[in-house]
Amino acid sequence: MTDSFRKVDEVVLHHGYIFDLVRAEFVSPEGESFSRDIVRHPGAVSVVPVAEDGRVIMVRQYRPALDRFILEIPAGKRDVADEPPEDTAQRELGEEIGVRAGSLQLLGTFANAPGFSDEMSWIYLGRDLETVPRDVQGIEESHMTIERVSFDAAIAMIADGTIIDTKTVVGVHLAATLVGGG
């Protein structure tokens, strides 16, 4: 039971651009004290945008942590205070691929790495796309490319290890069950 554990203290070890690292102190139900380092993250939103032709619009983006470009669905950090996740989704679609979704359907919400992080992610299916001015943000986005991929091709790329991004793997599979792809 989670309510039988108590957090008694938390100290920020590092305040970063994307996340904070904290050391939290807890007491177990038996009264034993222990500490854990935890990544505090505001959360993220991603969208599986499906074009009129049924293909998924993806981005190939440089990811510094992996030191390579990877193919993924549009996504971004929930870095605007009190912004609803649906609004973050629309903002990210505009920034990364220059579209707005006429229809957003929540596919799921999940904990990215609950063993060490509080980051939660929302994944949406975006349909009825309309073109808007692209609003590129940051160095990585200025070098990303946009690709249209069929569901069958995306699922094949997941199976062969070409697509390795977790949110993309989850989002493509969930969306494919709804739109009949894959």
Task: List PLM regions with ranges.
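Active-site segment of metal-dependent pyrophosphate-handling enzymes
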Residues: 20, 42, 51, 63-65, ...
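Conserved Nudix-box catalytic region and its N-terminal flanking loop in Nudix hydrolases
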Residues: 2, 46-91, 133, 140-141
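Acidic, metal-coordinating catalytic segment for phosphate/diphosphate chemistry
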Residues: 10-46, 52
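Short, well-ordered beta-strand micro-motif
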Residues: 23-25, 49, 125-127, 148-150
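Nudix hydrolase/Nudix homology domain
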Residues: 5, 32, 69, 106, ...
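Extended interaction-bearing regions that mediate binding to partners or small molecules
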Residues: 1-11
